[in-house]
Design a protein with these regions (language model features):
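Short, well-structured N-terminal submotif of metal-dependent ribonuclease cores
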Residues: 1-39, 50-63, 142
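Acidic catalytic patch
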Residues: 66-95, 102-106, 111
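Short active-site oxyanion
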Residues: 1, 30-33, 74-76, 112-117
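Alpha-helix capping/helix-boundary segments
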Residues: 9-10, 39, 84, 104, ...
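Acidic, PIN/NYN-like endoribonuclease modules and their adjacent C-terminal/linker elements
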Residues: 2, 105-106, 110-142
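Short beta-strand scaffold positions
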Residues: 35, 79, 99-102, 119-120
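Alpha-helical elements of the RecA-like P-loop NTPase motor core of helicases
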Residues: 21, 86, 126-127
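Short glycine/serine- and small hydrophobic-enriched flexible loop segments
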Residues: 45-52, 109
Length: 142
């Protein structure tokens, strides 16, 4: 299986959340893990925000960022090139997606692989991928 992760499916690998176990199983079951280059900055921003909100200590933030760097090496990256950006713009309008979600949607769609499964905890993104024929894994309902 080629496993595509959006940020909501990746952050629980770095910090303990209710979806951490299902995200870990998805990661472990994937022969190849893929995501948009956007995942890196989106994850770093989410972790920093969690620290600002008091959900993570500074030490936990630093440990999570080190783990981000470690796991990032195991991810095959889909570049955010003109093709992905233009498709994401169309999908944002057509499927009523936020910008980052539209980029994840377009990135997974671009892979066009039969054994691709895209993981997220975002129901709107699950619905969007479903409309495009992309198999999904809901990290909130494994």
């Amino acid at each position: 299986m080629i496993g595509y992760l959006d940020t909501s499916a990746f952050v629980p690998l770095l910090v303990r959340e209710s979806a951490s176990d299902s995200c870990r199983r998805f990661w472990d079951d994937s022969d190849v893990v893929v995501s948009s280059r956007l995942l890196y900055v989106e994850t770093a921003a989410a972790l920093a925000q969690a620290c600002r909100m008091g959900r993570l200590t500074e030490d936990e933030l630093n440990a999570s960022l080190r783990l981000l760097d470690e796991l990032w090496l195991d991810i095959d990256v889909v570049e955010v090139d003109d093709i992905v950006v233009e498709r994401a713009a169309v999908l944002a309008r057509r499927l009523e997606l936020r910008g980052y979600d539209a980029v994840h949607c377009a990135s997974a769609e671009r892979l066009n692989e039969d054994d691709l499964v895209a993981a997220t905890g975002d129901q709107k993104l699950i619905d969007a991928w479903g409309k495009l024929g992309v198999a999904t894994f809901n990290t909130n309902n494994p």
